[in-house]
Amino acid sequence: ILEREHRLSYSPRLMRDMDKAVARIQKALANDETIAVFGDYDVDGITSTVLLLDYLKNCGAKCLRYIPRRIEDGYGLSKDAIQGLRDKGATLMITVDCGITGNEEIDFAASIGMDVVVTDHHQPPETLPDCVVVNPHVGDYGFPDLCGAGVAFQLARALSDLNTALGHIDLAAIATVADIVPLTGENRAIVACGLKRLNLSPRPGVAALMRSAGMEGKPLFSETIAFQLGPRLNAGGRLADASLSFQLLTGSDDFELAAIADRLNTEN
């Protein structure tokens, strides 16, 4: 579906700095560096974090992750969080769904020996951060309306190939619907492919959430994500700790996943 129509077939390499991002990440993988993924507490940020960590861990990378807490930390990068990641050995930080306005924090990261690759979909400021920036609004990319997980999906695609990246298309689809970006062009294709995967073989955490919400065995549509799954995945980040949704999307123990799903269902 992604390649069926010309208007849906933008190469990830058309995004400004994508080649630089790929080169820096490949260098980190080759040198066994510790890579930190810095996300956000909403569905887009959480799924973007899971997507990129899944890909990097499948490549054998040593990874850290940081998802801010809405109340305690607020949105975006913070020097304290960056310092904490550096103290744990990270020499490369990749942001997902955030970072495009974090000029000061990115300068701080450079000052303590950490390279930064920003992947974000929000409107860029007049002065871009002094680092590698992958954003569909910057440069000549043909479709500016990707969500954060859509950008992360394109990064995974650039690092490998389309077939490998399609293993994470379910996450990009959930984020695309939940983040309320236009369901046209590439987004339409991402959601179509992602729904097919979700209906055929949902992640254990998604299946647990569907059971908890009384939707087991029912087909998933974009409306299901928008009004059922999305709000439940957002509940942790809105009220307490987005790591609950992260654990749900990355876990495999059915008993633990059921408990997390029930908690998110209750909080929603």
How would you label these PLM feature ranges?
Residues 1-92, 112-113, 160-268:
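Hydrophobic helix-and-loop "lid/oligomerization" segment in the mid-to-C-terminal part
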Residues 85-88, 93-95, 100-181, 187-190:
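Conserved phosphate-handling catalytic cores of large alpha/beta enzymes
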